[in-house]
């Protein structure tokens, strides 16, 4: 395995996931699943805070999820790969495929701007760039819930969503419209000046805590989301996984999770078929079909936040309900549950129910001792998973 970065380097802060990913990991590799569980943080409930001219309003969603630092996840997966005999070579950027030793299969997991994918037009790559600038930061404000915070400024609305990543540190993704970005001068300010301005704008939401621009990698920079699709995920003996194959908007919170599932499905297909091309054909057919609705939801979510000013003028409860509908239709009782969730006693009851659910799922997993892969030597088929990670509700 060639990794273009040095050991322990990562760009970004935290990743989020849900019980379905733990289920998949425990079925396929309980050792790494236990490590991921041990190094993750549980967050419960979601808050939507709106700071407008009328003061602060807060609305609530139920639900829970997990998060961990990106560096911790990479460490778990890299150490597990080494245990399984994988030759991991760090600091090795692949610029020319002809320089690689001959192989039956090349798996390209080099991100949305994949250089390997770019060497062939056969993938039919299409990249659409979103409108809103965003920046991926950290903060020493230790959020316990998943928090959306919207702030009215003289140049328009700016907002972040934040979640705990590791003890004492949270991930904080700031987004705004191009008009607000230019109006606040974020397009011309230096990196440090821009971060200090964001700290001042969000001083209430951050409770005076600081924003952190630099993780183990380079300082954070403003960017626009690249929505990547491909007509096919394989060509010859090269196959795409993760963001090289597909991207999902960060407001959906599923990119890392989907990349891991890609790898598992690819491994299953390779184990199922003797012929590599047959395996790649099945992987491509199943995963592209499963990701089609996910990417559609991603585009819808991205577009919703690009037009957030059409909704944010409502009271916080109505605004949060509109946010929860951005992925598409909901159950008929969704609105009633949303209204009930604004009551503290109902939120307490929902947390108690969620605690019971987590206990049940942990018991069912059983630490992976009787997983199918150990009994049969084959990976359990992961097809048919619910691929969309919906935080809201």
Predicted regions and their residues:
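Glycine-rich FAD pyrophosphate-binding loop
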Residues: 1-11
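C-terminal helical "tail/cap" subdomain of flavin- and related membrane-associated enzymes
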Residues: 268-385
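Acidic/histidine metal-binding catalytic segments
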Residues: 35-39, 202-218, 276-282, 291-295
